[in-house]
């Protein structure tokens, strides 16, 4: 990560709904910082110097959790398919919001009506309402209702569409996992007095909703005092690290195409193909 931060132009950026992408200039005073690497699980690394680091925390709820649960819930087969579904989904049809509970913002504790109060909360609410309706109309207790529900479920599945769309479920679960990671990352940064938080790993994949959720979580829990930083090549930290460990000659931007190289005749050669490199954020059509 040090290499990406200090050597690669237009590599590190912040993200928000108002100022979607803002590139950070490379800097030399990068330590200390927290690296949140999100793959199948999540590891959080405190980096204090070029060769000084320690794993300070993490969580088992990561990309593997999203993939595993969505493959069971909606039959998605690939991670990109799940992200595409999440793009089209509406989590408010699945999640219970503050506005669903109070009817408006809860200003006393600073919660907007659009804040998620309970991930998948409307699923539970619908189940409870169905149970009460069955008890009131058929005189069934909970045990009898559940037994009858399981008996009738096969017939109802034939005649009725699922109450929750696959896209809505995908978006809700993506938000749940991303928000959880963001909150834990903030808590670790507070515990270890770290003001800079970088997010990496193949879970992110340049996905706009994932990046926005992680960024919002850090901003929310820190009351705007901290930012989440992201990388254009977030999925290649391990590969580039293994490459650099071999200490290749002339590594870094020295003699790179980005700065121009000098050929045997002493002429500077520039590579104009590097001009339009942008982060691979998924757009709305993904």
Q: What feature does the model see in each segment?
A:
Residues 109-196, 203-207:
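Adenine-nucleotide phosphate-binding core of ATP-dependent small-molecule kinases
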Residues 3-7, 48-106, 121-126:
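Glycine-rich phosphate-binding loop plus the immediately following alpha-helix
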Residues 1-7, 66-71, 78, 83, ...:
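Glycine-rich phosphate-binding/hydrolytic loop that grips phosphoryl groups
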Residues 10-26, 131-160, 255-282:
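Intrinsically disordered, low-complexity domain-flanking/linker segments in eukaryotic proteins
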Residues 1-33, 48, 243:
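Conserved phosphate-binding catalytic cores of ATP/NTP-utilizing and phosphoryl-transfer enzymes
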Residues 190-200, 210-221, 229:
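Glycine-rich, charge-dense phosphate/pyrophosphate-binding loop(s)
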Residues 36-38, 56-61, 174, 206, ...:
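Active-site nucleophile and cofactor-binding loops and adjacent substrate-binding regions
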Residues 33-41, 45, 85-86, 266:
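Short beta-strand segments
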């Amino acid at each position: 990560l040090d290499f990406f931060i200090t050597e690669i132009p237009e590599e590190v950026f912040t993200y928000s709904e108002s100022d979607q992408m803002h590139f950070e200039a490379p800097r030399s005073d990068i330590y200390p910082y927290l690296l949140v690497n999100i793959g199948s699980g999540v590891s959080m690394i405190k980096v204090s110097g070029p060769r000084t680091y320690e794993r300070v925390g993490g969580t088992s709820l990561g990309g593997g959790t999203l993939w595993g649960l969505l493959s069971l819930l909606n039959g998605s087969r690939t991670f990109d398919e799940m992200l595409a579904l999440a793009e089209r989904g509406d989590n408010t049809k699945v999640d219970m919001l503050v506005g669903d509970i109070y009817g408006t913002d809860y200003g006393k504790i600073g919660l907007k009506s659009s804040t998620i109060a309970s991930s998948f909360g409307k699923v539970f609410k619908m189940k409870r309402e169905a149970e009460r309706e069955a008890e009131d109309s058929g005189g069934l207790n909970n045990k009898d209702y559940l037994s009858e529900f399981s008996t009738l479920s096969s017939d109802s599945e034939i005649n009725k569409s699922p109450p929750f769309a696959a896209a809505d479920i995908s978006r809700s679960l993506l938000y749940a996992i991303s928000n959880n990671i963001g909150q834990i990352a903030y808590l670790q940064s507070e515990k270890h007095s770290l003001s800079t938080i970088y997010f990496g790993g193949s879970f992110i994949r340049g996905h706009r909703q994932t990046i926005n959720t992680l960024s919002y979580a850090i901003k929310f829990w820190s009351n705007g005092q901290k930012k989440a930083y992201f990388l254009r090549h977030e999925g290649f930290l391990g590969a580039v690290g293994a490459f650099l460990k071999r200490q290749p000659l002339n590594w870094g931007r020295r003699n790179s195409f980005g700065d121009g190289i000098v050929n045997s005749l002493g002429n500077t050669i520039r590579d104009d193909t590097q001009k339009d490199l942008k982060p691979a954020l998924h757009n709305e059509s993904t």
